[in-house]
Amino acid sequence: MASSSYTSLLVLVALVTAASAQLSPTFYDTSCPRALATIKSGVMAAVTSDPRMGASLLRLHFHDCFVQGCDASVLLSGMEQNAIPNAGSLRGFGVIDSIKTQIEAICKQTVSCADILTVAARDSVVALGGPSWTVPLGRRDSIDANENEANTDLPGFNSSRAELEAAFLKKGGLNTVDMVALSGAHTIGQAQCSTFRARIYGGDTNINAAYAASLRANCPQTVGSGDGSLANLDTTTANTFDNAYYTNLMSQKGLLHSDQVLFNNDTTDNTVRNFASNPAAFSSSFTTAMIKMGNIAPKTGTQGQIRLSCSRVNS
C-alpha cells in the first residue's frame, strides 16, 4: 500500500511538472497585452474599498488550486461552493466576475478565469503591502467542479499538523516549508466564530489566556449564537501583509487550531521562528510556495475551455 501511494505521488508530481512547463509569464503579451493591468486595477479598487477582500481573493485561489488543480472550478455556481469548507465563507466572486467582464470587452474569450484568479491573488497580496512575484500564465478553465474533493482535500480549521502536512504533500510539489509559508496568508483576513469557538472555550490549552478572553466577548459559547461573528486572523496588523502571523503564534495567539499547531513543540517550530525573526525569509518562501501552488495541475493546451463567464461553463 505504501509503495502504491508513493508511486501515485510520483505520477502526480510528473504530471504537475509537465503541465506547469507549458505556462509562461508572457502568455498574453500578444493576445491580450492589457490583461494584467486590467486585473491589477480591478483588485486595487476592490481592496481599497474593502481591505478584507484581499484575503478573500487569496483564499479563493487557494481553495481553487487544492481541488482538481488551479482551474477556476471553485468559481462555477454550486458544486464546490456548497462544500463544507466553502459554504457561507468564500467571497470575491463578484470581483472576479467584474474583472472578467472588463477583459472580455477588450479580448474576447482569450484570458481564462483560472489565470484571472491566480493573478488577482498575487495583486491582492501586493495591495496590502506584501511581496510580488511573477505569475506563469496559460491556464484554461475546467468544465466541471468537484464538491466531494473539496470536502476531503481542503485542510480544515481543526486540522492537526500531521493532517495539514498530508494535505499539502498530496498536492504534489508542496512540502512542509511551503505549508508553513502559505499558512502565513493568515496575516490578513478574518474568520468566523464557529471556526474558533472550541479553541477559546477550553478546547485548546495552547492559547494565550487574555487573548482567548478577548475573543469570547464577540463569540458566545452557545452553538448557533454569533456563529458568523468575525475576528482578525492577525491580532496585530490585520490589514497589512507581513510576518506578524508568526510572532503571534509564538505568543500563542493563533486564532485557529490549525494555525497554532504550527508552533506547538513540534517539527515546524523552527520554521515559524525563522519567519518571525526574518521577514525576508518569509517573503521569499511565500512567493516560492505561491508559484508552486499556482502550478498544481493546470489545464493547458486544448484541455478545458476559456469560459465566457466565470460562474458557468460555455453553452
Curated annotation (Swiss-Prot):
Note on cofactor: Binds 2 calcium ions per subunit.
Positions of substrate binding: 155
Positions annotated as glycosylated: 158, 265
Residues under site feature: Transition state stabilizer: 59
Alphabetical GO biological process terms: hydrogen peroxide catabolic process; response to oxidative stress
GO MF assignments: heme binding; lactoperoxidase activity; metal ion binding
Annotated catalysed reactions: 2 a phenolic donor + H2O2 = 2 a phenolic radical donor + 2 H2O
Enzyme class: oxidoreductase
Signal sequence bounds: 1-21
Subcellular location: Secreted
Needed co-factor(s): Ca(2+); heme b
Residues the entry annotates as binding heme b: 186
Pyrrolidone carboxylic acid: residues carrying this PTM: 22
CDD domains in the record: secretory_peroxidase
Descriptive protein name: Peroxidase 1
Active-site positions on this chain: 63
UniProt main location, coarse: secreted
Database matches in Pfam families: peroxidase
Protein's UniProt keywords contain ATP-binding: no
Keyword list, A-Z: Calcium, Disulfide bond, Glycoprotein, Heme, Hydrogen peroxide, Iron, Metal-binding, Oxidoreductase, Peroxidase, Pyrrolidone carboxylic acid, Secreted, Signal
Taxonomic superkingdom: Eukaryota
